[in-house]
Structure formats: C-alpha cells, structure tokens
Swiss-Prot record:
Transmembrane segments: none annotated. Its main location: cytoplasm. GO terms for molecular function: 4 iron, 4 sulfur cluster binding; lipoate synthase activity; metal ion binding. Its EC number is 2.8.1.8. Residues 294-308 have a biased composition (Basic and acidic residues). Keywords: 4Fe-4S, Cytoplasm, Iron, Iron-sulfur, Metal-binding, S-adenosyl-L-methionine, Transferase. Binds 2 [4Fe-4S] clusters per subunit. One cluster is coordinated with 3 cysteines and an exchangeable S-adenosyl-L-methionine. This is Lipoyl synthase. NCBIfam families: lipA (TIGR00510), PRK05481.1 (NF004019), PRK12928.1 (NF009544). It comes from Rhodospirillum rubrum (strain ATCC 11170 / ATH 1.1.1 / DSM 467 / LMG 4362 / NCIMB 8255 / S1). The gene is lipA. The keyword Metal-binding applies.
Length: 314
C-alpha cells in the first residue's frame, strides 16, 4: 500500500493557481547537492530536527548548507497559521518534543557553529506560544556551546500572557528577530493571523526587557507594496528601536500561494539600503535573495562592530 502524500497546505488546495511573472536573471540559486549539504541533511534526520531552510523552501539553502550552516526550526514542522507567502505546513501540530533542546545543542556542537539561528512555527495551541521551549533551547545551547552566539527568530506570541515574550528574552539570546514581513495594508491578505502593530509593539517591548539585546526585523517586497509604504515601515521599526533591517524579494513557493506582484530590481534594493542607513539602522541587508538568517554569523560580527563604532562616535 502506498503512503498517502502529505498535503502541506490544506487550506490552499481548492484555490485557483496564481501564476507569477518569470524570474529575472538576477535570481539564480544553486540546489543543495554538495557533500556538505548531504551531511547537514543526515544530521537533521538523525536528531529528529527541522530546518526552516527546507520547510520554507529557502532559495539560499544550497549556499548555506555547503557552508554547514542551518536555521533550526523548533516546536515541530506544522504551523497553526496559514500565511499566504509561507511554505511551512499548516495544520494541527503534534506534541512538543522534550528532547529537542538536547538534540539541538548536540547538532550545534557537531556542526561546530559559532552562531546559531533558532526559529519556530507558530504554536497558537500552546498556552505560552512555545516561549518556554525557546527558553529551554537557548539555555541548553548556551550550556553546551558557550562560545556560540544565539539568534532567535520568534513568532508574535499574540494573545499569550505578557510573560511569554519575557521568558524568551530573559534566556539571553544575543539577537532577537521578529519579522514584520510586509506593510500594514497587506496584512489582511498576506499575514491574516497577525497584526502589524502587535508585532511592532513586540519589538519595542524586547528593548524594554533587555536594552542590550540586538533587535532585528525584515520585510519582503514584491507583494504589491509601494515605496512610500516601505519607507514608513522603516520609520516604524526605528521608532521601536530595531537595530538591523533585512529586505528581500518575495518568491512564490507554489502556485497555490500568493503570486509575485513584481520583481524588485537590484538598484531598488540598493536604494532601500541607502535610505535605511540614513534613518539610523546599525545594519541593513537589502537584496533580492536577502533572507533573515542568510549570513547571520557574519552579520552578527558586523552588528557588534557597528554598535561599537556608533558608541565611539558619541
């Protein structure tokens, strides 16, 4: 008997296909076919771990896995949200794997990581949204790999107790990332389970809990936003004290996902970067293939140096 194929997005199955424009020549990526990539994949399977690299169909997976870098996705591979842009499976999640913090730390040690990025699916089914599990993962990695810097990319903990966010921040990540993803006008169609100003307030609260932690947020472009809306998001992020901004091109995972409205040119990305630096961000990454965790290890070193340089000029 053949296994029933997994339907990753049951809520999208009945939708008509949404063809996107053809990708331009500046969007070219390599498949994850290197020996190093095979080793990373095998390690993840052996430790029962998931990566956002695979689950979200990241275009940079070939490059990152060749460098033996991966972004760990905790709390399972099934999300309780159904964002229009995301390739992660939607449905009813299973139990939380209590062994995951240990397996995660084992993998960080085995890969010799100097910087690790930990993200998760949304777990609206959990009382704390998974905050306690984030705390345990951070603590375990810190214990097993004390020289490894830790970056978290969290969900919004919407409708969860105030202490949920504090639980994550107080575990002591070096970088706290929460992506706004798009401009507020597009939230009802692109990110219907979230609220723009809630996410913005979350980033602001992180700095209140720990003023020393680096905060980071990103958006996708090519979804139908205007230039003026992108600049307003930059201003909103700076008002919330965000240190590091990432801007990348939205790429459609399947024909059932929202279509690409347009492909933003490399020159436009450069223009956004120049404007953002002028608004006071410590760091900006803006290019067609920029993703939240792409080159996160190198970016963390640059981020620390940027803060030191800024302090020296005051």
């Amino acid at each position: 008997m053949m296994d029933t194929p997994i339907i990753r997005h049951p809520e999208k199955v009945r939708r008509p296909d949404n063809p996107s424009p053809r990708k331009p020549e500046w969007i070219r990526v390599r498949a994850p076919v290197s020996h190093e990539a095979a080793e990373v994949r095998q390690l993840m399977r052996s430790k029962n771990l998931f990566t956002v690299c695979e689950e979200a169909a990241c275009p940079n997976i070939g490059e990152c896995w060749k460098r033996r870098h991966a972004t760990f996705m905790i709390l399972g591979d099934i999300c309780t949200r159904a964002c229009a842009f995301c390739n992660v499976r939607t449905g009813k999640p299973g139990h939380v794997d209590d062994q995951e913090p240990v397996n995660l730390a084992d993998s960080v040690v085995a890969m010799g990581l100097k910087h690790v990025v930990i993200t998760s699916v949304d777990r609206d089914d959990l009382a704390d949204g998974g905050a306690g599990h984030f705390h345990r993962c951070i603590t375990e990695v810190r214990s097993r790999a004390p020289s490894c810097s830790i970056e978290v990319l969290t969900p919004d903990f919407r409708d969860k107790p105030q202490g949920a966010l504090a639980r994550v921040v107080e575990a002591g990540p070096d970088v706290f990332n929460h992506n706004l993803e798009t401009v507020p006008r597009l939230y009802p169609t692109i990110r219907p389970g979230a609220r723009y100003f809630h996410s913005l307030k979350l980033l602001d609260r992180v700095k209140t809990i720990d003023p020393g932690v680096f905060t980071k947020s990103g958006i996708m472009v090519g979804l139908g936003e205007t230039r003026e809306e992108v600049l307003q998001v930059m201003d909103d992020m700076r008002s919330a004290g965000v240190d590091f901004l990432t801007i990348g091109q939205y790429l459609q995972p399947t024909l059932k996902h929202v279509a690409v409205d347009r492909f933003v040119t490399p020159d436009e990305f450069k223009d956004y970067a120049d404007i953002a630096r002028g608004k006071g961000f410590l760091m900006v990454a803006s290019s067609p293939l920029t993703r939240s965790s792409h080159h996160a290890d190198r970016d963390f070193e640059d981020l620390r140096k940027a803060r030191q340089d800024a302090a020296a000029t005051k």
